[in-house]
Amino acid sequence: DVLHNLKIFFGYEQFRTYEGEALQEQAVQAAVKGKSLLAIFPTGGGKSLTFQLPALMSGHSVHGLTVVISPLQSLMKDQVDNLADRGITDAVTINGLLDPITRALSIQRVQNGEASLLYIAPEMLRSKTIEKILMARHVVRFVIDEAHCFSSWGQDFRVDYLYIGKFIRKYQQKKGCKEPIPVSCFTATAKQKVVQDIRAVSYTH
């Protein structure tokens, strides 16, 4: 039950709503049911919880790993730190800002199954080390934050984002997945052309 887990992990009695819409709960329920989704969330709208809660649930139930891809290294660290402040130590980030010792410890925590949430930048998917540690884990979902970076129509276009879909396909082939691994895309941009681009290259269609 997602409300039960919401209380256990985050201490909240209910999900937030936006102008009467239960966006948070809808996104969590879709993820828990194993669906891919594209969610348009307002900035500061409680988006993080909608992928963190299902990730923590699957981490505890099936020892799954959720891979969160974000272009903003400082925000990744903030999210990991915020979870740690709540006593949740399941999340790690591996990025270029880490010193060698911290990086090695983060890699070790993913390898030994302590982490159920891994935050990385899209360019890290080209790393053989990252590929190796992901191959050794049961990845249950890829979460793509700031998904408007897929779109050449947006001013935030990132060419590294175009590699994400290729990586997911390659990963599934190497793992011999019978079913596609679910993908969640999050953006604050509702422009139709941008949304079409996200669907086309993010592997959510």
Label every model-predicted segment.
Residues 77-97, 109:
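Conserved helix-turn-beta segment of the N-terminal RecA-like "Helicase ATP-binding" lobe
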Residues 32, 48-61:
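Walker A/P-loop NTP-binding motif
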Residues 133-172:
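SF2 helicase catalytic motif II
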Residues 56-79, 87:
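Conserved SF1/SF2 helicase motif Ia
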Residues 204-205:
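Conserved small/polar residues in nucleotide/adenosyl-binding loops
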Residues 1-40:
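Conserved pre-motif I regulatory segment
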Residues 100-141:
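Conserved helix/coil segment N-terminal to the catalytic DExD/H
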Residues 42-43, 148-149, 168-193:
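Conserved helicase ATPase motor motifs in RecA-like P-loop NTPase domains
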